[in-house]
C-alpha cells in the first residue's frame, strides 16, 4: 500500500473518532441539561418531584433538617404572628391540616359549664400573662402552645385538646398544633369578649326580655349579681349603681370610644378604664354562661391604681370609693380640672356658689369681735366651684333611749337636708385654728345627680354611724328652688327621679352594702346584694338607711314609668 493511501485511511479513522467524541460530548451536555431542569423546577415549588428523580443518596440529605424546622415552627407558633394556614397558602401547600381545622374531632370534649373568663388572664403554673391559653375542657389557663409549653404538656398528660388564645380569640388543637375554625365556637368568644352595636346599645333600656344562661338560670341583662370575693361589697354596690347610668354605660359598652385615647408610656391608670369597660360589657351581656359576674379583674385594677387604698380583703367606704373612682376615670380618660371634659363630667358634674365668712375666735372679747368683723379678712367671699356629688348632712342622732330601752331612730324628710343648698342656710365649719360660716347655692344641675348622705362621723377614738331614716319620694323631686334666680330661667328641667339607692346595714366597721336599682326596660325595682338578686316594692326602698343615691333628670318628652 502506498504512503498516500495510508495517510487517507489514517485521516478517515481520526475523523470518525472526532465525530464520535463530538457526539458523546453532545449527549453528555443534553444529560446535564436534563439534570438541571428538575433543579430549576424545584426552585419553582415542586420539591417532591426533585427528590424522586434525583439519586437515592440525595433523598436522605434533608432528613436531619426536618425535626429542626418543625421545632422552630412550633416555637414560633406561640407568638401567633400569623395563622399557620396562611403560611401554608403562601408556600403553595394545602394539606390535610386545613381539613382538620374544619373538622376537628375533639369539639365534643368542650365543657362550657366550667368556663369562667372573669379572672385575670395568666398561666396557672408560670403566672405569666404572655400567650395565655384557656383549656376548654377543664377551664384552666396555661401558657404557650409550642413544644415543652405548659399548654402542650397539659394536653398530652390529660388528653385535653381544645384551647383558646385569650388575646387573639383563636382556637387551637393540641398537641397536633393546628387552628380550629368552627362557627359553633362563636358563643365562647362572645362570652370572653362581648361586643355591642350602636343599635343594640340604643335598645337596651327598651327591652324587658329575660335571658337564659347556659346553666338554665334566667336573668335580666344589667341586673346581674357580682361576686363578693371577701370584703368588696362596698365596691360591688358602687359599680352596680354606675352600670345603670345609661350615658356612662353606653360610652363604655362601645370600646371604640376610648381605646384610641393617648396616654403617657407606662401609665397604669388607663387599665382602670379598660377593666371598667370589660365589666360593663359582661354585666349587660345577654348571652352569658352564668347569671352572675366576678369583678376580680376590675378590683385588681382598683387595688393597683389606688396604691392599695381600696382592697378586696378589707371593707371600705362607699362614698370614698365613689369619689376616687369618678376622679380616676376622668383623669385616665384624659380629662383635666378646667378645660378638657370627659363623659364623667358630662354625666355627673354640676356647679355651685360657695359663700364663706371667717369668724373671730370665740374666746375674744365682744368689742374686739365687732372690730374684727369690719376688716376685709372677715368679709364674705364667693367662689364658683364644681361638684360630682352633693353631701347631705343628717341631724344629730339622740343619745337617750325610749321607755323600752331601745334607741330612738329619728326620721327626716329629704327636703330638710337639701336646705343646705338653698343659698340661705348657713353652717359652721371648724378647723384647727379658725372657724368659718358657709352657705351654698346651686348654679347648674347635671343630668344625673348623686346624693351622699353623711352617716359616719369620725373622732379620735372610733367611727360612729347615724341611723336616721331619710324619707324621700321615688319620683318627682323638684330642685328648682335650690337654684339661683338668674339660673332658674335657663334650667327648664329640674325634676329628678331615683334610679339607684345604695344602703349600708350594720355597724360602721362590720356592716354590709346592698343596692336598689331601677330596670328601665321593665320599670321594676330590684335589690342586689352580691350574688343575690330579688325584686322589691318601691315603698320598701324608703325604709332603708340610704347612703348613696343617683337621681336622673327628667326630660320634657320623658314619661314616668316607675309607677311609684
Curated annotation (Swiss-Prot):
Q: Which reaction does it catalyse?
A: Thiol-dependent hydrolysis of ester, thioester, amide, peptide and isopeptide bonds formed by the C-terminal Gly of ubiquitin (a 76-residue protein attached to proteins as an intracellular targeting signal)
Tell me the superkingdom of the source: Eukaryota
Grouped into one coarse class, the protein's main location is: nucleus
List the biased-composition ranges (Basic and acidic residues): 28-39, 84-96
Binding site residues for Zn(2+): 135, 138, 154, 160
What residues bear Phosphoserine in this entry? 46, 81
Q: Could you tell me which SMART domains the record lists for this protein?
A: ZnF_UBP
GO MF term (any one): cysteine-type deubiquitinase activity
One GO BP on record is: protein deubiquitination
Q: Which SUPFAM superfamilies match?
A: Cysteine proteinases, RING/U-box
What the entry lists under Gene3D superfamilies is as follows: Cysteine proteinases (3.90.70.10), Zinc/RING finger domain, C3HC4 (zinc finger) (3.30.40.10)
Q: Which GO terms describe its cellular component?
A: nucleoplasm; nucleus; spliceosomal complex; U4/U6 x U5 tri-snRNP complex
A Pfam family per the record: UCH
What does the UniProt function comment say about this protein? Deubiquitinating enzyme that plays a role in many cellular processes including cellular antiviral response, epithelial morphogenesis, DNA repair or B-cell development. Plays a role in pre-mRNA splicing as a component of the U4/U6-U5 tri-snRNP, one of the building blocks of the precatalytic spliceosome. Specifically regulates immunoglobulin gene rearrangement in a spliceosome-dependent manner, which involves modulating chromatin interactions at the Igh locus and therefore plays an essential role in B-cell development.
> What does the subunit section of this Swiss-Prot or TrEMBL entry state?
The U4/U6-U5 tri-snRNP complex is a building block of the precatalytic spliceosome (spliceosome B complex). Component of the U4/U6-U5 tri-snRNP complex composed of the U4, U6 and U5 snRNAs and at least PRPF3, PRPF4, PRPF6, PRPF8, PRPF31, SNRNP200, TXNL4A, SNRNP40, SNRPB, SNRPD1, SNRPD2, SNRPD3, SNRPE, SNRPF, SNRPG, DDX23, CD2BP2, PPIH, SNU13, EFTUD2, SART1 and USP39, plus LSM2, LSM3, LSM4, LSM5, LSM6, LSM7 and LSM8.
Similarity remark: Belongs to the peptidase C19 family.
What is the name listed in the Swiss-Prot or TrEMBL entry for this protein? Ubiquitin carboxyl-terminal hydrolase 39
The organism encoding this protein is Mus musculus (Mouse)
